[in-house]
Each structure stands twice: as structure tokens, then as C-alpha cells.
Amino acid sequence: GASITASNTVTFTVDRFNSYGSAAAKYTVQQNAGSVTPPVGFTNYLGCTSSSAYSVGASDFFAVSQNIEGVNTADLSWGTASAKTVTLSFQAYSSLTGTFGGVIYNALFNRSFPFTYTISSANTWTSISIPIAGDTSGTWAGYAVGLTLSFSLGAGASVSGTAGAWVGAAALRAGLRGWSNACSLPRILRFAGAAPTILSRASKRLLTCLC
């Protein structure tokens, strides 16, 4: 597909994912960006490519995200004492090594779970698996957006937070830093097969990224 330039408004891109940047035109999103071989079991992937050098400010954030409908998340029972644990699994491929991040948050932007993952080898697909304890607080059910999964491509200090725990802060919807504090060429981050899975029923996936 064609390359889509991220703007400072939500722009739909590949396979239900959307892009956003607090500063426009700092990265592009494209199916099969860079034309690398997809991971085993996939024919395509979502690729994000840095477009220009940029120093990320304290309140800046850049991300690709997917909204998951409430009808697909209601049986997680999040927001109750019976909240179920899920595992977020995906394949990641980067021109850089290091720690990357993202976040899961609710439709009201007041419950967030920042997470990190590590890519130790550049330019190779890495399998990522992140357990996420169900949130016993907040509002999660509904027929519109149930939750949002967001992969950070860069985030400043005021919109970042400590990974691995639920927080009641809208500011953390940007997640962790992603591409560190400066976007510069050439930096490419690719994803395939992003899917939260309920641990107690591993066959159920809340979303599937076919990109």
C-alpha cells in the first residue's frame, strides 16, 4: 500500500491502526515498509519510518494505535473485581536495538497500563509477549471503544510513565519513549500479529493485526 504521512490529527493507516503525532510529518506508516520478509505465518506487516530529525519535547508523543470495540472486550470484566489477565503478543522488527514502549488505555483516557519491550538484535523479527493484569478500576465496557492498544514511536517526559502497573492518568496514554528522545533517519519499526489474548482462554484473541 501507499505510504501515509502521520499528522497531528488521527489518521487511519493499515489494518485498523491509526497514526498520530503531536508534530506533523515526523514519520510515515506503510504496509510492508522497507520490503523485509514478514515473520513466519504472516504475509504482511505494518511499518513506521522516521521522516526527519526531531527532538521530542516534554509533552510530545507519536504513536500507532488500534481501538478495540467494547463488544470484544466486555468479557474481560475489567473495572470489576473479576478482571481477567491478558497477554499481549506480537512480532517486532527494528533498525535499532533497545527498550521500546506502548500503552493500553480506556475510552475515557483515565486508566492506562504503560508497557515496555526489548529488541536485542536489530533487523530481525523478535517475538514479544507481555502479561497484563486486568484492571479492577475504571470504566471499560461499552459498545464503542472498549480499549486502545498504542505503540509509542516517541514520547516526552510528561506523557511517559513507569511500565507494568495501572495508573489513573490520562497523560500516560502516550506510553513509553519508543524511539528515544530524538527521531532521526533512518529509523524503522515494524509490527506483525499484535493480539491481546485472555490467559484463561488462550484461543480467544481480542484483535488480530493481519498487516
Positions of PLM-derived features:
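Extracellular and organelle-lumenal recognition/adhesion modules and their flexible linkers in secreted
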Residues: 1-211
